Amino acid sequence: MATRRKDARPDEIRAAALALFAERGFAATRLDDVARRAGIAKGTIYLYFPTKEDLFRALVRQDLLPNLAALEQAAAAHPGPAPARLRDLLATMAARMGAPTAAIPRLILAESGNFPALARFYAEEVVARGLALLASVIAAGVAAGEFRPVDPAAVAPLAVAPLVMTLLGRNAIGRHVPATPGPDDLLATHLDLLLRGLAP
């Protein structure tokens, strides 16, 4: 039992950190707070994560990047034409923005000015890889004549930007603007506009 508990500690610490980062923000959360939330002694957390930045990097690598890898695999295995691949990819991205790990991009957007090294890490590990995935699907569509000739690298950030804005709006002012369409309606409208704009 003790061995299982010890093996589970990194997962428990990351879960506690994610919850606290979402509640308080990165800057306002201390490692001691995370240790208390995880139910471990203050000193124990430093055996696993010497700094708060190390803990954040572990969150990205252990909890976020596997989701991105799954998206890459699903896109590569998708049997449909490029428009269907792009639609399904963006729909899956949008669905995952409701998961607890959606707190991570929110943190980066909110606090990147104070933590440039973490912002750079996130940009290199997550953003660049996600944009490359989108660009590859768009490029395949252009090559197959399923999309009109466009620069995939220019279209990729435009394809995902409305999803990011919806995520931010939902957690900031969205609840104060009751007339705003729901996430599903916004996604459907975005996909319709995007795919019509890419049509040959």
Whereabouts are the PLM-identified features?
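Short, flexible, glycine-rich and Lys/Arg-enriched loop motifs at helix boundaries
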Residues: 61-79, 171-179
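Short amphipathic alpha-helical segment with a characteristic S/N-K-E followed by hydrophobic residues
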Residues: 13, 28, 51-57, 66, ...
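Basic, helix-initiating cap at the start of DNA-binding domains
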Residues: 1-40, 47-48, 53-54
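Hydrophobic/aromatic-rich alpha-helical bundle segments in the mid-to-C-terminal region
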Residues: 120, 142-191
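Hydrophobic alpha-helical connector segments
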Residues: 72-103, 153-159
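Amphipathic alpha-helical packing segments from all-alpha helical-bundle domains
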Residues: 96, 103, 107, 117-143, ...
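Hydrophobic/aromatic residues within well-ordered alpha-helical segments
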Residues: 9, 52, 63, 97-104, ...
